[in-house]
């Protein structure tokens, strides 16, 4: 029977019949007689490509949840998300209204937005239109799915909705299928996800009993055996125009967006390895099949009317999407006005609004620089860099990507726990493991073997304790005998100490080995080491001007009982501490053979130059040095002096941010540090630090462009000197790697703030970890939650993050920047479609890039008083 005939029946309110093509009795036959396979595959693949990946908890990095949608303008995506899934992309109007009424958004900001947005000018939108819109809630209709319109029985208010029930069932199935750590029984992984779900639901009809569907078991017998048959079966039954298939399928995936994002991550990792992965297609088939199962089970007049209504709504989807996009224009104007207020302040701090701009002189002449300190570009580094520079002007601070150019994976001593230490966009190509040696190189293989044996022995006991605490019959006597470490950790959570950060990579090592366990590159020859070192020094901009002491400062956070702890660590290191990277790089650059290779490549490292690895604890703003026992006396003296400077600078930064964490900045320095440590070690503390909340801008240029400016920990800072980059290759790297990482961070915070219900992970207090590391449930049901928790964004009284799109400011000729844009579609989409703002330093002031041209910033003055439009 043709699709047209099925649609005509639906319009008359008739249900599909058992012998219709694709209906229950013969799904395989329906697949053969239905739509061409390539058209089904194209629609399913398009829907799956719309889902951005979500990394597991132990490698948590920030991701723009709309990353796979950047090929369309941001307002179009805002309309699609609203209509397909009730997801908000722009800031809620109540937040904008509050910012307007408090003068956070000034009239000049609104005027600027109306002038800068061509669509607003074309529509003749006025300030009054925009202000009036703030009094009206934005209610955009969502296109219905089968599970929504079939939820119409008289008892629907006394039970879960079908959307909730199906999400729960699919979610629990995924949790069981993907579990690797928590469960003592695991499914066989020779089954596909679809096959596992089909087998599970065929034997467990509990959802039918709970939801009042006694016919579910009968309908399940018609469930197709394979994912491919299920896709065809559902699309035949739906009878929707092919043009709307991708949108309908995307809307279906968005009902289980958390698990879809996990499956997208598995696909991302497979592609990095040159392989393929089908989990996301399986998940789509599962979720699609549920709609048809429900339709079969509710085969009555009401169900037939509901089915016809779905078809009608989706035939009109293009008009609905266009209307939503038009209605969201005012919200796009307010988004830009919100950003303009911050941008004007930023431009003023950089001294570039309406003033002639030339490259400023360095704060300290090169010959007077005694120390170079390279920090991660992370916004939390900015206050510390500023403080260090103010205390000791002979220190030159540098911003560089936090993985320090090392494409490595790290395997701790005596473990198989290999982990990436580089951005999620990349795959590791080098390996790091631990060497064990004293200051004079003593120990070698013998000491390493002894340390490995001791660690494995301790791990064996720890694993027994871990297993005991997971089993229902756990005996306190066993925990008492073998799990004292666990009880100690629990006791510390309940009564937090004021101890400094513990290095987890040393867990299980006896104390005598901890000081001499050092990460090192393996499997790489001297020539490759020299090539790697040369690229990194050129990237940092110090290949021609090395100070006597060069400190490489990674960063890490400190928290207890925090499932999302990795999200506070270094995103460029894939949610890990930057310790491994800086220690390996310092060792590499101090190596005699590497320096000889650098000399052959035209880079002379002075004999008295020493590289030291350090770590910035972003929770307590403490600095820790590594491998300082290897320093010669002169370098050790320089390090001691710098460590004192770091101590004063850290105290300054702690006072600067004390108010944000509810502490008194006037507190005595030791007490303030102790209070921050206590918060960090408190297992009940849901806000150990604010992470990257507030991030809003990225400056790519020499430090002289921002030196002395108080940027409030809101700016990523990456050093770059275009005069030393004659072919533009370094600029291209910066715009296609660090800029994308910063954009991912910025949009994760943006999305989690604008729509915490859909794009955030909810309340930390209610989190339950899924699969040991996959993600979290809020409570014990519902979809896998992705994004940031409410406590990461809100202090209980107000939002600590403003959802502003990233403003990228580059110090480079316009032609050089445009060449990168033209060569990279991803970069072009981000800029042309409004996912970030692009500025550059010009000869007479800042310029903004819009409509493929550079325009003067022309943001106007910020009036002292509000004028009614």
From Swiss-Prot:
Compartments (UniProt record): Cell inner membrane
Any GO CC annotation of this UniProt entry: plasma membrane
Keyword set includes Cell membrane: yes
Binding site for Zn(2+): 376, 378, 555, 570
UniProt keyword list: Cell inner membrane, Cell membrane, Membrane, Metal-binding, Transport, Zinc
Biased composition (Basic and acidic residues): 8-17
GO molecular function, one term: zinc ion binding
Secretion signal span: none
Entry keyword Membrane: yes
Pfam families reported in the protein's UniProt record: DabA (PF10070)
Membrane topology label: Peripheral membrane protein
Record region (Disordered): 1-32
Needed co-factor(s): Zn(2+)
Quaternary organization: Forms a complex with DabB.
Purpose: Part of an energy-coupled inorganic carbon pump.
Protein family according to the UniProt entry: Belongs to the inorganic carbon transporter (TC 9.A.2) DabA family.
Official protein name in the record: Probable inorganic carbon transporter subunit DabA
Gene it is expressed from: dabA
